[in-house]
């Protein structure tokens, strides 16, 4: 969890002991070592540029960029993605970059604007859209992932996650 907001760390702190073990680390702790059987997810702050972005990219095989349906987020995403495209590993296609619409309300004008923008991003994959709903609040409070929560209440969320899981090849 490299984001000062600490959302990932907070989620891990809420995780029940009887669930699969997930190790966490913050930028203030010794970094986790990645083995061939390990997936390491870095939660980084928004609007990272320059040498900090370069440092994060060197550790990545894939980058998922969530974008919320708001004029400010869309503008920030355009700037970030233009910067990201100029980075060597992205130019050489050594890193896959995927886009996710986050907290989407499908039938709103701003979501349609975001959806159109993400579809048109050249060289980047628009993977899926996650709807805005309370299951993510429940997930944050319980330390559970969507696929660990009740199937009947998360069925639509699971469908929205499947394209991302497939893209990540998890």
Where are these regions (language model features)?
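Beta-strand-loop-alpha "switch" segments that mediate conformational coupling across diverse proteins
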Residues: 105, 115-147
């Amino acid at each position: 969890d490299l984001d000062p907001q600490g959302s990932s760390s907070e989620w891990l702190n809420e995780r029940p002991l009887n669930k699969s073990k997930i190790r966490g680390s913050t930028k203030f702790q010794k970094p986790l070592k990645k083995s061939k059987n390990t997936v390491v997810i870095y939660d980084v702050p928004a609007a990272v540029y320059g040498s900090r972005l370069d440092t994060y990219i060197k550790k990545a095989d894939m980058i998922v960029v969530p974008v919320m349906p708001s004029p400010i987020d869309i503008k920030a995403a355009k700037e970030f993605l233009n910067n990201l495209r100029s980075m060597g590993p992205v130019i050489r296609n050594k890193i896959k970059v995927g886009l996710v619409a986050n907290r989407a309300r499908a039938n709103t004008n701003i979501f349609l604007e975001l959806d159109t923008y993400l579809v048109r991003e050249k060289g980047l994959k628009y993977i899926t859209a996650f709807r805005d709903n309370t299951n993510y609040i429940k997930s944050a409070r319980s330390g559970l992932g969507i696929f660990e929560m009740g199937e009947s209440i998360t069925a639509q969320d699971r469908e929205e996650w499947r394209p991302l899981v497939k893209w990540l090849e998890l």
